Amino acid sequence: MGKDLFRYKGMKRILTLITCLTLIQTAAIIMQAEWLSEAVTGLFNGKGITSLLPVIGFFLIAFIARHGMTVARQKIVYQYAARTGADLRKSFLDQLFRLGPRFAKKEGTGQMVTLAMEGISQFRRYLELFLPKMVSMAIVPAAVVIYVFFQDRTSAIILVAAMPILIIFMILLGLVAQRKADRQWKSYQRLSNHFVDSLRGLETLRFLGLSKSHSKNIFYVSERYRKATMSTLRVAFLSSFALDFFTMLSVATVAVFLGLRLIDGDILLGPALTALILAPEYFLPVREVGNDYHATLNGQEAGKTIQEILSQPGFKEETPLQLEAWSDQDELKLSGVSVGRSVSDIHLSFKGKKKIGIIGASGAGKSTLIDILGGFLEPDGGMIEVNGTSRSHLQDGSWQKNLLYIPQHPYIFDDTLGNNIRFYHPSASAEDTTRAAASAGLTELVNNLPDGLEGRIGEGGRALSGGQAQRVALARAFLGNRPILLLDEPTAHLDIETEYEIKETMLDLFEDKLVFLATHRLHWMLDMDEIIVLDGGRVAEIGTHNELLEKNGVYTKLVKAQLGERA
């Protein structure tokens, strides 16, 4: 049994309870065999059915007790697995939020979604199957063979000799099955990530005319998963056949030896019949574990992966900031901040409320800097100061409550338009929601929906264009009205006409706020109070649009390159 299971809350208590129920069940199995043997022997010796009614009654009581314990164990384990699965999902999601979007992006969004949904369900199934059957395998065979030893030593010796052979064979097949299952799980993760990436990029693929050719890639990834699954199933069927074959062979061997000694008069019918009835019970727990082993492999892998994520070190513990709403007197400083090769030796200072543009070529470190400012990423080195308080990162409740993050692809929930807008402020009134929608330019969409703000959008309702989705994100920002805005390429996926349509709305939103806008589109820089130019992960230049043009440096090269592309 994996030691990792003992880290789950209540595991020791549930194992103790299962062990007690299994001991009662084992006693019922043995007495069931004893009383059945006694009844059959009595009938064989010519006793009347009436005289055997007490024995038959005891047999029925043992039979009911045995299966009653099975039902009780299943119910207890099911409830425990459901509770553990719910707690594990909560811990997993909390850890993902602590680690931030950067971690989810690195590991693959598809894999994280799969683990949170199917992975935890598979782990629950693993607990339901593994716990009671492993306890049974530890108790039932030992108790049965000891009882058989006092009935017939020869049968007990045969059973003891057969068990190691069966277990060794099961281990060998299990190792093969484990490799197959690992390959299948990796293929499944790859399929999940590929599916999510394909959905995200479907519009781009269609625009480029590559959607049909991409279907070949989808078929290839799906086919690899199918082959991995079928390969695992072949091993599962083979191991089930092998377990059944060796079990039947062992029981047949016991039966042959008992039959020969019955003929010779070396053993009485009662003990022989008891030993024969108990022989299949001796192997049954091992067979059940072997048959269900393959069904639990994905659950084991999912549990292992989830525990690896849960054990990921979080952000360094820091003294919480006592930051109220960001004001003109507040100040943020970054001194020598570095993150791997993405950004290095960043020195920046921001005070009060102003619009700050962050530009640079692809890979210059714009998104990394935004992640640092949002508290999504812990720098490898350097120091951050908020109003004179030094910190190693910005993952802090009071800081992040001041933030509102608008990504490149805002998520639209399968819900009403109003609830989507109220994402950051669920208790907002209908009047405030309507005002935010109007400020974001969503009045036409509200009027076109049959139920207005209560009309459904997203997967289960009306689909939105890229511009409309971005306006929903802006409406959230208007309603949330937080003093610090982080925008990471918010218009990169929009055509230039749509971008200019929502630009005025965004500029209205930027007023009286500290804004960090990372973008490739340089026309935004004309409206920025300060521009940070990144080059190779370092701050190359800082200034206004006109000041940077006069320097004729990196910024000027970016402007000329973009003008050249347009020309």
Curated annotation (Swiss-Prot):
Task performed by this protein: Part of the ABC transporter complex CydDC that exports the reduced low-molecular-weight thiols cysteine and glutathione from the cell. Export of these thiol-containing redox-active molecules may be crucial for redox homeostasis, permitting correct assembly of various respiratory complexes and formation of correct disulfide bonds in secreted proteins. CydC contains transmembrane domains (TMD), which form a pore in the membrane, and an ATP-binding domain (NBD), which is responsible for energy generation.
InterPro entries, A to Z: AAA+_ATPase, ABC1_TM_dom, ABC1_TM_sf, ABC_transporter-like_ATP-bd, ABC_transporter-like_CS, ABC_transptr_CydD, P-loop_NTPase, Type_1_exporter
Primary location class: membrane
Domain ABC transporter: 321-561
PANTHER family listed in its UniProt record: ATP-BINDING CASSETTE SUB-FAMILY B, GLUTATHIONE_L-CYSTEINE TRANSPORT SYSTEM ATP-BINDING_PERMEASE PROTEIN CYDC
Source organism of the structure: Bacillus subtilis (strain 168)
Gene Ontology terms describing biological process: cysteine transport; transmembrane transport
Domain ABC transmembrane type-1: 17-298
Gene3D superfamilies: ABC transporter type 1, transmembrane domain, P-loop containing nucleotide triphosphate hydrolases
Domain notes: In CydC the ATP-binding domain (NBD) and the transmembrane domain (TMD) are fused.
Name the record gives this protein: Glutathione/L-cysteine transport system ATP-binding/permease protein CydC
Assigned EC number: 7.4.2.-
Lineage top rank: taxon: Bacteria
Entry similarity comment: Belongs to the ABC transporter superfamily. Cysteine exporter (TC 3.A.1.129.1) family.
Keyword Translocase: yes
Subunit structure: Forms a heterodimer with CydD.
Leading EC class: translocase
Protein's membrane topology: Multi-pass membrane protein
UniProt subcellular location: Cell membrane
Entry keyword set: Amino-acid transport, ATP-binding, Cell membrane, Membrane, Nucleotide-binding, Translocase, Transmembrane, Transmembrane helix, Transport
Transmembrane segments: 14-34, 44-64, 130-150, 156-176, 240-260, 266-286
One GO MF term attached to the UniProt entry: ATPase-coupled lipid transmembrane transporter activity
Record-level GO cellular component terms: plasma membrane
Coiled-coil annotated spans: none
Originating gene: cydC
Disulfide bonds: none
Catalytic activity: L-cysteine(in) + ATP + H2O = L-cysteine(out) + ADP + phosphate + H(+); glutathione(in) + ATP + H2O = glutathione(out) + ADP + phosphate + H(+)
